[in-house]
């Protein structure tokens, strides 16, 4: 019979139970009681998620999709591959060890973190050296198998594949080619798979999303011998590709000695024909037809029409699935009591998507009539959404149509603007600043909660937030920073805050998704045309500026990041939606400038993240992304300084586009890579000013001034002192004030030391 399954379920819990359990564990110093509570929470969450999958009608539950912090790190723990610098015993790895690799400890900094393909999820980057070894690791996956079987479930295991695990890592300490480690890694996977078979697991989903990339020949050539080595003695293997088109590798994948393949038909519907043609008779084909990355309800009739010919060709060898893991969507729409009722009918979260998968399976097996009520309701909703008046704003459409190329360019060249800005601000060499946010303290959270609950009135809330702005300004002045920020106390999230104030956006109550570890975000829903009804940030920036003679930056989130970190409407091109957001931000920058704010930061941390996985599609994306930023930033005068910020990014392949943004100052995350990201600037003459991060804010570890000084000196090897800024990697929202106080004082001290050295070395 046609099988219904999903590639993975969100692990945070419907009420973010995992987040809070993790934070209690860390706060309690990883005590035995705290660890027991954390382990119990994980076990309860897995049981609940499997219950949802069973009740939806799926044919199996997925185990191995759970992770305490990150599934790539967990895979490394399974195969004994954590970085050697930590000195951990792979077979005796504890939760404390695992978290030390993720978050750093007193002896070692945390593992580097970067985006999982083109999503907003972050994984921990494996570290590979000539000395790297693999072997038996933790028992966690087998614990999950035993739990599922004890509850009576048929379990399919999920693992990050060996090729993807190597591809995602970084070569260090003289290792020339990561593939050289494959002969060491494959035996560890073989042993893991053999044990899964012994444990009674029939199917193992091996995630190899790198087959959606433009792979070098050496990596393609490694696929067949790898799976020829893995298949004997293993359960049935389902190799899963997702996030883009894998059709260029279709012949290779179909020839692998595995029991099935999975393809993503949401991101790359056209690839289906390449896989169905001459599909091997000994394989199942899992079709990812329900979107694992967006929240809009599936058009079941359309999906059924797409799958019916595949069913006719393959029969029971057709499996129905989500496009990718549901890690990227909220858990359950049932926890949205305050969401607009019409909008709510357009949505499906993870729990609803599991049922959509099962409903499509039922229609294929039993006929549409067997699930007519579900299909008819979905059809009515799809038609209503297409024609809803709340989606379309004629004024916005006219403004987008009237945009010209000149609207996306500053009036003067950078050299002219830089002179005007130097004259206006008079900053010292190596100016110091921060990226924007300061700690979201319990006081801030209590005030926000009281305001939302109606306990605190609007005036009381404003007064509470203004007090937090004053505290942030006073602290920055005490540190000796040169350029200040207001601290963003009023913002619960850098995208959601703006989504609450822009028309065309909607905000959920509980639509949380995991970003990394315990960090969760609540992406807004972009359901219609975007419009700015009134200024969003001017009052906060103006108040902060009134507290100091030093410049205070206005803080905005850029159009591409707003797009990338939201659930975006799927009824018009993303480029069009980006331009609508850019127009709203352009008006905000002009309002800030009019209010006397001379520096405006428009953050685009997701610019690189949005880059298509396929090289052939990147130029078009970068063209509209750069244009959107230009429209947002280019209405201001020459002496208004535009900043931007990017994080979690590899920049080498898009430096020309970053330069084309023409921001006066760009700050980037570089600490975890030990300034490696700046290597690209040795061959590309970046024309404007740049602030490479010198303090890793993702770790609770506080650097001293000597460490920061070393990083500044490394940056000076690539960036002229006249164009170098000193700042942390990212915003400081997730840190505690005691950490921030020590780190920023050290940063300012280090900058002063290096400034003195540079000035002393300058010709008289």
UniProtKB/Swiss-Prot annotation:
Q: Which residues bind 5-methyltetrahydropteroyltri-L-glutamate?
A: 16-19, 115, 519-520, 565, 609
The pathway this protein participates in, as annotated, is: Amino-acid biosynthesis; L-methionine biosynthesis via de novo pathway; L-methionine from L-homocysteine (MetE route): step 1/1
Which Pfam families does the UniProt entry name for this protein?
Meth_synt_1, Meth_synt_2
At the top level of its lineage, which domain of life is listed? Bacteria
Q: Where L-homocysteine is bound, by residue?
A: 435-437, 488, 603
Locate the active site: 698
Question: What reaction does this enzyme carry out catalytically?
Answer: 5-methyltetrahydropteroyltri-L-glutamate + L-homocysteine = tetrahydropteroyltri-L-glutamate + L-methionine
Per the UniProt entry, the Enzyme Commission number(s) are 2.1.1.14
Q: Its biological function?
A: Catalyzes the transfer of a methyl group from 5-methyltetrahydrofolate to homocysteine resulting in methionine formation.
Name the PANTHER family on file: 5-METHYLTETRAHYDROPTEROYLTRIGLUTAMATE--HOMOCYSTEINE METHYLTRANSFERASE
Write the protein's name: 5-methyltetrahydropteroyltriglutamate--homocysteine methyltransferase
Organism lineage: Bacteria, Pseudomonadati, Pseudomonadota, Betaproteobacteria, Burkholderiales
Its encoding gene is what?
metE
């Amino acid at each position: 019979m046609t099988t219904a399954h999903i590639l993975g379920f969100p692990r945070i819990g419907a009420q973010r139970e995992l987040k809070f359990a993790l934070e209690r564990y860390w706060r309690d110093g990883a005590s035995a009681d705290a660890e027991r509570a954390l382990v119990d929470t994980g076990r309860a969450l897995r049981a609940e998620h499997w219950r949802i999958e069973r009740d939806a009608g799926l044919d199996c539950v997925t185990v191995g999709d759970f992770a305490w912090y990150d599934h790539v790190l967990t895979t490394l723990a399974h195969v004994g591959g954590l970085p050697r610098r930590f000195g951990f015993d792979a077979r005796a790895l504890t939760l404390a060890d695992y978290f030390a690799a993720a978050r750093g400890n007193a002896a070692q900094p945390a593992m580097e973190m970067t985006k999982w393909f083109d999503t907003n999820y972050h994984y921990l980057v494996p570290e590979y050296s000539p000395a790297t070894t693999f072997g038996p690791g933790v028992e966690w996956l087998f614990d999950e198998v035993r739990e599922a079987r004890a509850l009576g479930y048929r379990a399919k295991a999920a693992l990050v594949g060996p090729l993807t695990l190597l591809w995602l890592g970084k070569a260090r300490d003289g290792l020339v080619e990561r593939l050289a480690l494959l002969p060491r890694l494959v035996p560890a996977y073989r042993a893991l798979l053999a044990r899964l078979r012994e444990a009674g697991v029939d199917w193992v989903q091996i995630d190899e999303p790198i087959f959606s990339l433009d792979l070098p020949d050496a990596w393609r050539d490694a696929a067949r011998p790898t799976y020829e080595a893995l298949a004997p003695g293993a359960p049935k293997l389902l190799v899963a590709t997702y996030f883009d088109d894998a059709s260029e590798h279709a012949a290779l994948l179909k020839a692998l000695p595995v029991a099935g393949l999975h393809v993503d038909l949401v991101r790359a519907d056209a690839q289906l024909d390449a896989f169905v043609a001459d599909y091997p008779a000994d394989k199942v084909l899992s079709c990812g037809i329900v979107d694992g990355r967006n929240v809009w309800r599936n058009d079941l009739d359309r999906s059924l029409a797409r799958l019916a010919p595949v069913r006719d060709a393959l029969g029971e060898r057709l499996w129905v699935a989500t496009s990718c893991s549901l890690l990227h969507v909220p858990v359950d729409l049932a926890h949205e009591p305050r969401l607009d009722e019409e909008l709510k009918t357009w949505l499906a979260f993870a729990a609803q998507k599991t049922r959509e998968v099962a409903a499509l399976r039922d229609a294929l097996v039993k006929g549409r009539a067997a699930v007519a009520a579900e299909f008819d309701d979905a059809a009515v909703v799809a038609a209503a959404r297409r024609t809803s008046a709340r989606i379309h704003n004629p004024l916005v459409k006219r403004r987008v149509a009237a945009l010209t190329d000149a609207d996306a360019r500053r009036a003067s060249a950078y050299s002219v603007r830089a002179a005007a800005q130097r004259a206006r601000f008079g900053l010292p060499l190596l100016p110091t600043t921060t990226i924007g946010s300061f700690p979201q303290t319990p006081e801030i959270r209590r005030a926000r909660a009281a305001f939302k609950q109606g306990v605190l009135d609007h005036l009381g809330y404003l007064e509470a937030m203004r007090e937090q702005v004053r505290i942030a300004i006073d602290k920055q002045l005490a540190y000796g920073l040169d350029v200040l920020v207001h601290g963003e106390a009023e913002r619960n999230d850098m995208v959601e805050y703006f989504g609450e104030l822009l028309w065309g956006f909607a905000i959920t109550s509980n639509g949380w998704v995991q970003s990394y570890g315990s960090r969760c975000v609540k992406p807004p829903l972009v359901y219609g045309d975007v419009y700015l009804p009134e200024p969003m940030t001017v009052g906060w920036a103006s108040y902060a500026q009134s507290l100091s003679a030093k410049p205070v930056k206005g803080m905005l989130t850029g159009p591409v990041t707003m797009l990338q970190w939201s659930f975006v409407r799927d009824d018009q091109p993303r480029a069009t939606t980006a331009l609508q957001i850019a127009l709203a931000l352009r008006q905000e920058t002009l309002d800030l400038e009019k209010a006397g704010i001379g520096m405006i930061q428009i953050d685009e941390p997701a610019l690189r993240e949005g880059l298509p996985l396929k090289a052939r599609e990147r130029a078009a994306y970068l063209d509209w992304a750069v244009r959107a930023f230009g429209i947002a930033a280019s209405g201001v005068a020459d002496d208004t300084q535009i900043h931007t910020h990017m994080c979690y990014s590899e920049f080498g392949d898009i430096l020309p586009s970053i330069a084309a943004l023409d921001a006066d100052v760009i700050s980037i995350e570089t600490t975890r890579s030990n300034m490696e990201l700046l290597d690209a600037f040795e061959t590309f003459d970046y024309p404007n000013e740049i602030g490479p991060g010198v303090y890793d804010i993702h770790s609770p570890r506080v650097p001293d001034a000597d460490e920061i000084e070393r990083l500044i000196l490394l940056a000076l090897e690539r960036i002229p002192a006249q164009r170098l800024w000193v700042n942390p990697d990212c915003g400081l929202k997730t840190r505690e004030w005691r950490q921030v106080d020590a780190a920023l004082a050290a940063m300012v001290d280090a900058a002063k030391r290096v400034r003195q050295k540079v000035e002393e070395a300058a010709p008289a």
